[in-house]
Curated annotation (Swiss-Prot):
A GO MF label: magnesium ion binding
Record lineage: Bacteria, Bacillati, Bacillota, Bacilli, Lactobacillales
UniProt organism field: Streptococcus pneumoniae (strain JJA)
UniProt cross-references to HAMAP family, sorted A to Z: Thz_kinase
Protein name listed in UniProt: Hydroxyethylthiazole kinase 1
Keywords: ATP-binding, Kinase, Magnesium, Metal-binding, Nucleotide-binding, Thiamine biosynthesis, Transferase
Amino-acid positions noted as binding ATP in the UniProt annotation, renumbered to this chain: R115, T160
Gene from which the chain derives: thiM1
Pathway(s) this gene product operates in, as recorded in its UniProt entry: Cofactor biosynthesis; thiamine diphosphate biosynthesis; 4-methyl-5-(2-phosphoethyl)-thiazole from 5-(2-hydroxyethyl)-4-methylthiazole: step 1/1
Protein role: Catalyzes the phosphorylation of the hydroxyl group of 4-methyl-5-beta-hydroxyethylthiazole (THZ).
Length: 260
């Protein structure tokens, strides 16, 4: 099974083209975990950096026409150097423009995984789910949404919510770890996309296990953070979450994982 130890040994360079609001939090989270983030946003620079990268995150949270072109350029370069790319289609169910951009990136470029909440992923496959911007109401059929997207796009899918679902090659697992504090801190979902990009390329042909490990590490770190003194307060939780990403071990994952 792909391990946190392997991530720390490889320390993959992860190029993050992400939401302006979350860049600092994302970079600190990846460093704490053991990856090496770069927040590059210029095609010529990406040409230089991606040849050394272990992963690329495309997060469409701060969406403009210029950024759309940047996403396209980055994905072309990533494919050139066989760098696994993860798409976070932020709020793609909230409006036609975001949906159009997400559809373009999925249909015309090579992706290693898509990570989104239930509302976002459901919108990509035409399933009706109550959603509001970047947030999504709790749903009971999250595994069905993940499988539907996996079957439609033939891409590994991670759907997050109160329960998380991972679908790869028609197989689905659900993760029942996590903290209710996570949605109360802006950027936790965006950082998760970067964490997925850190793990997805560690072992070729082991995408399901890599994604499962990424989700378990992330969610169990959230549980650890909430248990710290004042971890029930969002400001403290944010700091303790970074600390927990730094301290979590494979032994913690093995002990506390809840997978079905």
């Amino acid at each position: 099974m792909t391990s946190l130890k392997l991530l720390k040994e490889k320390a993959p360079l992860v190029i993050c083209i992400t939401n302006d609001v979350v860049k600092n939090f994302t970079a600190n989270g990846l460093v704490a975990l053991g990856a090496s983030p770069a927040m590059s946003e210029f095609p010529e620079d990406l040409e230089d950096l991606l040849k050394y990268a272990g992963g690329l995150l495309i997060n469409i949270g701060t969406l403009t026409d210029e950024n759309w072109k940047l996403y396209q350029a980055a994905l072309k370069i990533a494919e050139k150097y066989n760098v696994p790319a993860v798409l976070d289609p932020v709020a793609c169910g909230a409006g036609e423009y975001r949906k159009k951009v997400a559809d373009d990136l999925i249909n015309n470029y090579k992706l290693a995984a898509i990570r989104g909440n239930a509302g976002e992923i459901a919108s990509l496959v035409g399933i009706d789910v109550a959603s509001k911007g970047v947030d999504s109401a709790g749903v009971d059929n999250i595994d069905e949404i993940a499988l539907a997207a996996n079957e439609k796009f033939n891409i590994p899918i991670v759907v997050t919510g109160e329960v998380d679902a991972i679908a790869v090659n028609g197989e689905v697992v659900t993760i029942h770890n996590g903290s209710a504090m996570m949605p109360k801190v802006i950027g936790t979902g965006c950082l998760l996309g970067a964490v997925v990009a850190s793990f997805i390329g560690l072992e070729k042909g082991q995408e399901l296990k890599s994604l499962e490990t990424a989700m378990l590490v992330y969610n169990i770190a959230g549980e650890m953070a909430e248990k710290r003194p004042n971890g029930h307060l969002p400001g403290t939780f944010k700091v303790e979450f970074i600390n927990s990403l730094y301290e979590i071990t494979d032994e913690d994952v093995k002990e506390f994982k809840r997978v079905k």
